[in-house]
């Protein structure tokens, strides 16, 4: 599933290339995504001009003239593709085609059909059923150790599950949760409510750092994710633990372990991420190794 860095990459490209373009027509596949695409969508957005593109967590918010916003979620396999000159042969699994007045087109493709696409009056976005339950966006509101510790107070869920809970932090998914906890030297199985403030401080710092590093490389591509120009992200080559089961840790050479938590794969280093913090760890700040800086 595209996570915050992938969605932010798409957002920046959409903002750069589409703002100012006016929608001439819209064609829908008629197939249901995670929820039905409203039949009224073409009528709602036809004739409107794109005025801005925002993001909250994994949701894209495409603002249109007349105070209307397209709410989009890429789901497991969704992607937005932009064509200055559309291909003659249509691609499979394209569920929406927006044609602009200059002849360029924006396509929403989603093979697995877990995405979301609808239009909402901009003033009603805070009450939207998808957006209203999301926690803060970590790039818009960078977390702090004290803030995360307070949010996790009494939580029995694992540190990994805590990071994945979109009601607490919007945008972190399976790939980056494993990477963040490795960088912070926190065992993903530990109860979130038992982490000390300095440990949460390390998580907060690495969360911001990892997400920004991934954005700089246009995100991570393993199979389906592509940018607006159908290009893959290149952050996969920088991953420390994710999808590296049984390979040596880049920091200490211990084999990386893979476990399953809440039906999702988790990757970690048993040596760098001990199940119990070293004595005094909760009282001193963590340092970064050379592998972390690379």
Where does each model-flagged region fall?
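Phosphate/anion-contacting hairpin/loop surfaces
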Residues: 70-183, 191, 198, 204
């Amino acid at each position: 599933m595209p996570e915050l860095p992938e969605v932010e990459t798409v957002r920046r490209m959409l903002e750069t290339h589409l703002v100012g373009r006016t929608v001439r027509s819209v064609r829908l596949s008629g197939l249901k995504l995670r929820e039905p695409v409203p039949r009224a969508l073409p009528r709602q957005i036809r004739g409107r001009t794109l005025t801005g593109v925002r993001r909250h967590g994994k949701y894209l918010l495409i603002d249109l003239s007349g105070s209307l916003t397209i709410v989009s979620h890429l789901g497991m396999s969704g992607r937005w593709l932009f064509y200055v000159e559309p291909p003659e042969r249509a691609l499979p699994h394209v569920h929406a085609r927006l044609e602009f007045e200059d002849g360029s087109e924006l396509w929403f493709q989603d093979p697995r059909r877990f995405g979301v696409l609808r239009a909402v009056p901009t003033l009603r976005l805070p009450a939207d059923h998808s957006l209203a339950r999301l926690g803060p966006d970590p790039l818009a509101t960078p977390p702090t150790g004290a803030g995360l510790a307070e949010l996790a107070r009494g939580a029995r869920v694992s540190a990994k599950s805590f990071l994945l809970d979109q009601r607490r932090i919007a945008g972190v998914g399976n790939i980056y949760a494993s990477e963040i906890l490795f960088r912070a030297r926190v065992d993903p199985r530990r109860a979130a409510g038992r982490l000390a403030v300095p440990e949460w401080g390390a998580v907060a710092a690495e969360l911001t750092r990892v997400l920004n590093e991934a954005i700089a490389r246009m995100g991570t591509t393993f199979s389906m994710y592509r940018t607006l120009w159908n290009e893959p992200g290149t952050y996969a080559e920088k991953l420390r633990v994710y999808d590296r089961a049984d390979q040596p840790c880049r920091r200490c050479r211990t084999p990386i372990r893979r476990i399953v938590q809440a039906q999702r794969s988790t990757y970690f280093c048993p040596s760098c991420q001990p199940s119990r913090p070293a004595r005094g760890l909760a009282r001193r700040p963590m340092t970064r190794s050379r592998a972390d800086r690379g």
